[in-house]
Amino acid sequence: MDFAALIYHRQAFLDGQWWLPFTAQLVHFSFPHVLVNGAGAVFLYVFFHPWLRGTSQWLGLLGGWIAVAVVVIADASCGYYAGASGALQGWAAGGALAMVGASGSRWDRRRWLGLSLLLLLLLKMWLLPQMTATDLLWGAPVYQPAHWAGTVGGLLFVGMWTLGFATSQKQRADHQRAKHQ
């Protein structure tokens, strides 16, 4: 299979290949690019596994994936794109938000780890634009809007799910109280 055909190229997208903003996040520019993104995915899985259910992790990843696709399409200056880093940013940010927003009234280790991860993501996003493409292993530029979009998408998807879940739990509890009165 020619994986290069899955990379987002703006003109190919405009010519009707609507799937490219999504498939581009499954392919990479080089083997080191794959390794860095793969290592990030393994780290996130290992980091979140003891603390979170799969739902919030998948929602963070999905939110990042969709948000990256939207920003790649919306940005006329983005001529090409490949890589999972934006979607991984969504997974990281969404998972960290889920940890910070965990049920319970006290700030336990899970919440502090989630807050620390959110702060590290902000630091990374502040430092990364200061690096040039040659500073990176794969020699391709980092498309910062994808990282920002992925972060926002992960936060939005997990945040909306968390608020919806909390609201439905409160409604069920109110319903049960009303039923027993």
Identify the residue ranges that each predicted region occupies:
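N-terminal TM1-TM2 helical hairpin plus the immediately adjacent luminal interfacial "cap"
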Residues: 1-59, 66-82, 139-146
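Intrinsic low-complexity, intrinsically disordered segments enriched in polar/basic residues
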Residues: 20, 44-45, 101, 109-110, ...
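C-terminal transmembrane module of polytopic alpha-helical membrane proteins
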Residues: 26, 123-181
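Alpha-helical transmembrane segments of integral membrane proteins
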Residues: 34, 59, 108-119, 145-148
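Membrane-interfacial alpha-helical segments at the cytosolic side of multi-pass membrane proteins
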Residues: 35-52, 90-101, 152-165
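Hydrophobic faces of alpha-helical transmembrane segments in multi-pass integral membrane proteins
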Residues: 40, 59, 63, 67, ...
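Membrane-interfacial segments
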Residues: 51-56, 79, 100-105, 165-172
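Multi-pass alpha-helical transmembrane bundles in non-GPCR membrane proteins
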Residues: 65, 83-131
